[in-house]
Regions:
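ER/secretory pathway lumenal C-terminal domains and tails of membrane proteins involved
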Residues: 1-299, 306-378, 390-883
Length: 883
């Protein structure tokens, strides 16, 4: 009875879906639509009514459990793309907004021109055509200017697609993307990791600092990636910094040519395996910029194939020496060759051991333990990604730890097989409360729930606006047609047309003024397709009930059973008077899907007799927590649903604080061996250190507000002991906040130590990034901006803490100490760059960035002394003017 049975392959259909990996979707490989089809006005063919054209690509079947056979439920459909955007080698195909922006930024923005048909419609009056032309040309010129200065985005084209003719990427652009990014960055880079060397294990998005291949030979690496000896410690002192000096690569090349020369049949076999499992896999998968994680594992078979040539390279060296020595090689030399070559795998073993040693890596275990150990009995926990799901399931499976907790991965709830699994008991965890039956969420049923509250209000407001009468809308519409015209605002309106429109929308008039439903009422409305109002809504909006459903309100009311909430420990008795009678759920989307259907069904049955938690990994999107963001209590790694309102983000905090409970939880945290220097951690593990620090700083802040200064100090000392201030854990807002809290507690020495190490690392980063030539600095532009921003945050933290104590003089002193080196560096850079006239593009890029950095810092100075800030601004301005 496992937590998840992927695709439920107990049936033939489930097995087929499992093998076809249907959860990953499909994409074109040799011929199909480019990504511009999703932004151009002619990208997808349309029907006369304006809907997108689709074509049948197959049939959807399900297993009918009553009939005990497979039955057809719907057709599989795909868009019919415009012929201008269908092409050979559509390697740039994704319609993901972020991916499309990356396509354009990296491999060329799509060409576009003004669509004159937009303003040349002869059926429009001349004045309308002139007005349209003026608007179109103005927008077009603005887009051209944006393209010229490099600030244009794909979203700009999408907003103005009606005005433009957008051209797809050229074949040259598609091939460039395939060769440079897919084969080069996502293929050759991984190959070289294994046979040349690896810079570090930070996930790379084409930056020169993260996850590149290296050789260990400075003259080669520095030319490609900048001076590696000056790389910031975060990247340089990484346990995955492995240098093989290209020795495995060279051995493999020797073996490649030896086999080609001696046994071409076997050579072809290995070459075929190598190409199919490298180039073939990359061609088929069409990886996108950028993937959620490194995809080197997809090419592992090709590495095995090349390793065969590495082994044959030893034989090649023997044969080469034998040839050079004219077959006079002796036994000792013959033995020495493999012994010497054995040094290559030994070198790799020594280089790889520290980052492959998992003996002290307890990040996943600690994360799972910390999530589960602090939850109340019989809890429901919603999680969102692989990293906050599988470790938890793993701990429940292997140790039966907290197997009373029902863990639900929210992002998988769109799949019927997954909904079915969360609606059953798992080990000692009860199923989610819900009356949903399989027929309610099966394939092609309730795939899309349209929230039409705004549309309904718009329809009735529209017809209301043409009524000019003291009578109500329904009273006017009940009159004979010849009398209706007397109550219309414009005599030109056709009373029969108005009446016909009203009669069409009249069945759902009750929802015009009805803003909300209880979740129980909403669930019943969704489940009842015989409801006349819903049938009228479906007819009006032109969608058949079945795969599409409708919700006529955008506010749901969740009643609170206060007695149960206290009885089951969701709220403590001392907080009983703060509980609300009901929770209002404000739905901000106009389309809901199966995950939201499940949530509605669950809350329709919810009696506040089980605690509900949400993982911290999902709360950034209110929809992920069903818009319950104002009713959360911070629990550290999770947030608990409580019927006490705490506005989301109040005082810069997410969720209500419960310091007493949090302090108890904090004492029992697992720390994953982060404090051990010889422990190796993955990129994901290291990123979670910020979560621990944020939890500690939030708790310490709450304790300080309660006057519990000693406890706050203990919390801060504990987190700094267990997650030391080391480059591998990097700087984050949590660390900045800890230094501020130390200052607040009077622990000046500890605060200054943190600030000094933070400053040193940020300056190290900024200096390295600015030392790179422009073409390399471009790859780390966001990291440079982030380092400067972190520096500003560090300064702001120091200044704001002192200003809270009304110590303006010390705040000014601290600011000047941080600002003056930045200012001096800018002056030196600017004077050097302009010594012989105008700065070149490389220097201009650095100068522009430094000016923005200084402006950001002077914004902080303005908090302390506006006169000082103005004086510094004027000094910088005069420097620019006089040169």
């Amino acid at each position: 009875n496992p937590h998840m049975n992927l695709n439920d392959p107990d049936t033939a259909l489930g097995m087929l879906d499992y093998f076809n990996r249907v959860q990953y979707g499909d994409w074109p490989t040799v011929y199909g639509a480019a990504y511009t089809a999703h932004i151009a006005d002619d990208g997808i063919e349309t029907e006369p009514n304006g809907n997108y054209k689709t074509k049948i690509t197959g049939k959807n079947y399900i297993k009918d459990r009553q009939l005990k056979k497979y039955v057809w439920v719907s057709d599989k459909r795909a868009y019919e793309y415009g012929k201008n955007h269908v092409q050979f080698m559509p390697k740039m195909f994704s319609n993901d907004p972020n991916v499309m922006e990356n396509y354009a930024a990296m491999y060329g923005f799509p060409e576009f021109e003004l669509n004159t048909a937009f303003f040349n419609n002869l059926s429009d009056p001349p004045e309308i055509r002139a007005q349209k032309r003026q608007i179109a040309e103005q927008q077009y010129n603005e887009l051209l200017q944006k393209k010229h200065d490099g600030s244009i985005k794909i979203s700009d084209l999408q907003r103005n697609s009606e005005l433009l003719i957008i051209h797809p990427p050229t074949l040259a652009q598609q091939l460039n993307y395939f060769i440079d990014f897919q084969l080069g960055y996502m293929g050759f880079r991984y190959f070289m990791w294994n046979f040349s060397g690896r810079q570090n294990d930070w996930e790379g998005n084409m930056e020169v600092t993260r996850g590149n291949w290296i050789t260990g030979i400075p003259i080669i690496d520095n030319a490609r990636l900048g001076d590696q000896s000056k790389l910031p410690a975060k990247f340089k002192d990484n346990k995955a910094n492995n240098k093989y000096y290209m020795l495995p690569l060279i051995l493999g090349l020797i073996g490649f040519f030896v086999q080609l020369n001696r046994n071409v049949v076997h050579w072809w076999a290995i070459l075929s395996l190598f190409l199919l499992t490298s180039v073939g896999v990359l061609f088929y998968t069409s990886v996108k910029p950028f993937e959620p994680r490194e995809r080197d594992y997809a090419l592992v078979s090709s590495f095995y194939a090349y390793a065969i040539w590495v082994g044959l390279g030893v034989q090649g060296i023997y044969l080469l020496l034998k040839y050079l020595l004219k077959n006079k090689i002796n036994t000792k030399a013959a033995i020495a060759i493999p012994v010497i070559c054995l040094g290559v795998p030994i070198l790799m073993g020594f280089q790889n051991w520290d980052d492959h040693d998992r003996s002290k890596r307890r990040g996943a275990y600690a994360l799972a333990y910390n999530y589960l150990s602090n939850l109340d009995q019989n809890a429901i926990l919603f999680v969102y990604g692989d990293n906050d799901t599988y470790p938890l399931w793993g701990l429940q499976e292997t140790e039966l730890f907290r197997d009373d907790v029902k863990i639900v991965n929210y992002t998988l709830l769109g799949a019927p097989w997954n909904i079915e699994q969360v609606l059953r008991k798992t080990y000692n965890a009860e199923a989610l409360p819900s009356k949903l039956e399989y027929k309610d969420y099966q394939l092609s049923t309730n795939d899309n729930i349209m929230v039409v509250a705004r549309n309904i209000r718009s329809r009735f407001s529209e017809i209301q606006s043409i009524i000019s009468s003291e009578l109500s809308l329904s009273e006017v519409m009940s009159l004979p047609p010849n009398e209706i015209s007397q109550h219309l605002a414009d005599p030109g309106y056709d009373p029969m047309g108005v009446l016909e429109f009203y009669n069409e929308i009249k069945p759902f008039e009750e929802f015009y003024n009805k803003e909300s439903m209880t979740v129980q009422e909403a669930y019943e409305f969704l489940m009842n397709n015989d409801n006349p109002a819903k049938q009228a809504i479906a007819r009006h909006f032109g969608y058949p009930l079945g795969s599409v459903n409708f919700l006529p309100v955008d506010k749901l009311i969740l009643p609170v059973n206060k007695e149960n909430a206290i009885k089951h420990g969701i709220v403590s008795a001392k907080d009983a008077d703060q509980m609300e009678d009901y929770i209002t759920i404000n739905i901000s989307r106009q389309q809901l899907y199966k995950p939201e259907l499940l949530m509605i069904s669950m809350f329709a049955e919810y009696e506040w007799d089980r605690p509900i938690y949400f993982s911290g990994g999902g709360i950034s999107d209110p929809g992920n927590i069903f818009w319950l963001n104002d009713y959360l209590e911070n629990n550290g790694f999770t947030y608990k649903l409580i019927p006490i309102k705490t506005p989301f983000g109040k005082d810069g905090k997410l969720g209500r604080s419960n310091p007493e409970k949090m302090y108890e939880n904090f004492q029992n945290l697992e720390w994953a061996n982060y404090h051990k220097d010889n422990a190796s951690f993955s990129n994901t593990d290291r990123n979670y250190t910020n979560t621990y620090r944020n939890i500690a700083s939030r708790l310490a802040q709450d304790l300080i507000e309660l006057g519990e200064h000693q406890k706050a100090k203990e919390v801060l000392d504990k987190v700094m002991e267990m997650i030391p201030d080391q480059p591998r854990y990097d700087y984050g807002l949590g660390l900045d906040r800890i230094s501020q809290l130390y200052q607040t507690l009077g622990e000046t020495e500890k605060a200054e130590k943190l600030i000094n190490s933070t400053r040193d690392r940020l300056v190290e980063k900024i200096n390295f990034y600015e030392s790179l030539p422009l073409h390399l600095r471009y790859t780390v532009a966001s990291e440079l901006a982030s380092a400067r921003s972190d520096y500003s945050i560090m300064v702001y933290g120091q200044v704001s803490t002192l200003l809270e104590k009304s110590d303006t003089a010390e705040a000014m002193k601290v600011f000047a100490a941080e600002f003056d080196p930045v200012k001096q560096k800018f002056i030196e850079t600017y004077q050097t760059a302009t010594m012989n006239g105008e700065p070149d593009s490389n220097d201009k890029n650095i100068i522009d960035g430094q000016i923005n950095f200084i402006s950001e810092l002077l914004g902080i100075a303005d908090m302390i002394d506006t006169v000082y800030a103005e004086k510094q601004t004027e000094e910088i301005y005069n420097l620019l003017i006089n040169n």
